[in-house]
């Protein structure tokens, strides 16, 4: 049995596993560290045309995904994954962060409802206590790409996915990590000199105390310049 299971509701089932079938996530999928199933919302569509949307009450642009269609597809998903937490990628949602990812993993059974068109009927959110989640202040065509993004982040946190689990402690946004929730320092590798640009000499010194101090200073400087709001709790 896998550690994490995701049920994905979408009108484009062919988009999954997508990028999650490759690299670390793909290897973890093959090892059954995580698993998924996809439900095609259109299978629950109405009439011979499998309609899943309709015009908005009160007017406005765009079509709304119908609650009766979504309700039937969600009921099916819950039958497969009864104890799951349900998320709906939406620009109105709580912003997804590294700490939010860890919070999500307290429940290893997740359902992702991928919206399309103008959005979904609000009654669906109320009926199923759906949690809205945002990947940033911009608009995409649907919830599939945010779902792939969120799952990629979650999968990396699962035991056995990374060759060295300690890698997580030296990454950006890790509150208990090397950079205390700030951005990662600048990185360098061979060659020592490239196009007249040299690797900082401290990194070649072999003095681990000085190297660690340099990394922390770099992290603080970069965070202050690019994401100063991350420093408020540091």
UniProtKB/Swiss-Prot annotation:
GO CC annotations, alphabetized: cytosol
Listed Pfam families: tRNA_m1G_MT
A biological-process GO annotation: tRNA N1-guanine methylation
Gene3D superfamilies: 3.40.1280.10, tRNA(m1g37)methyltransferase, domain 2 (1.10.1270.20)
Top-rank taxon: Bacteria
Binding site for S-adenosyl-L-methionine: 115, 135-140
CDD domains (alphabetical): TrmD-like
Cited InterPro entries: Alpha/beta_knot_MTases, tRNA_m1G_MeTrfase_C_sf, tRNA_m1G_MeTrfase_TrmD, tRNA_m1G_MTases_N, tRNA_MeTrfase_TRMD/TRM10
E.C. number(s) listed in UniProt: 2.1.1.228
Localization of this protein: Cytoplasm
Keyword tRNA processing: yes
UniProt keywords, alphabetically: Cytoplasm, Methyltransferase, S-adenosyl-L-methionine, Transferase, tRNA processing
Catalytic activity: guanosine(37) in tRNA + S-adenosyl-L-methionine = N(1)-methylguanosine(37) in tRNA + S-adenosyl-L-homocysteine + H(+)
Protein's job: Specifically methylates guanosine-37 in various tRNAs.
Family: Belongs to the RNA methyltransferase TrmD family.
Summary of subunit composition and partner proteins: Homodimer.
Protein name: tRNA (guanine-N(1)-)-methyltransferase
Organism: Rickettsia africae (strain ESF-5)
């Amino acid at each position: 049995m896998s550690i994490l299971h995701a049920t994905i509701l979408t009108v484009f089932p062919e988009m999954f596993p997508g990028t999650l079938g490759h690299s670390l996530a793909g290897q973890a999928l093959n090892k059954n560290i995580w698993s998924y199933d996809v439900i095609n919302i259109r299978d629950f569509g109405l009439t011979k045309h499998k309609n899943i949307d309709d015009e908005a009450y009160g007017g406005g642009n765009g079509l709304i995904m119908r609650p009766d269609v979504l309700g039937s597809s969600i009921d099916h998903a819950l039958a497969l994954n009864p104890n799951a937490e349900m998320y709906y990628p939406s620009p109105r949602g709580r912003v997804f962060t590294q700490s939010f990812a860890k919070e999500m993993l307290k429940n290893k059974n997740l359902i992702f409802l991928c919206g399309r068109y103008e959005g979904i009927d609000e009654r669906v959110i109320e009926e199923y206590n759906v949690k809205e989640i945002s990947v940033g202040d911009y608009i995409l065509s649907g919830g599939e790409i945010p779902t792939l993004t969120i799952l990629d982040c979650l999968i990396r946190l699962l035991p056995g996915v990374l060759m060295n689990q300690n890698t997580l402690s030296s990454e950006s946004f890790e509150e208990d990590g090397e950079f205390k929730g700030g951005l990662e320092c600048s990185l360098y590798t061979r060659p020592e000199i490239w196009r007249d640009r040299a690797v900082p000499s401290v990194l070649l010194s072999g003095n681990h105390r000085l190297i660690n101090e340099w990394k922390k200073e770099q992290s603080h400087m970069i965070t202050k310049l690019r994401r100063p709001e991350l420093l408020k709790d540091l």
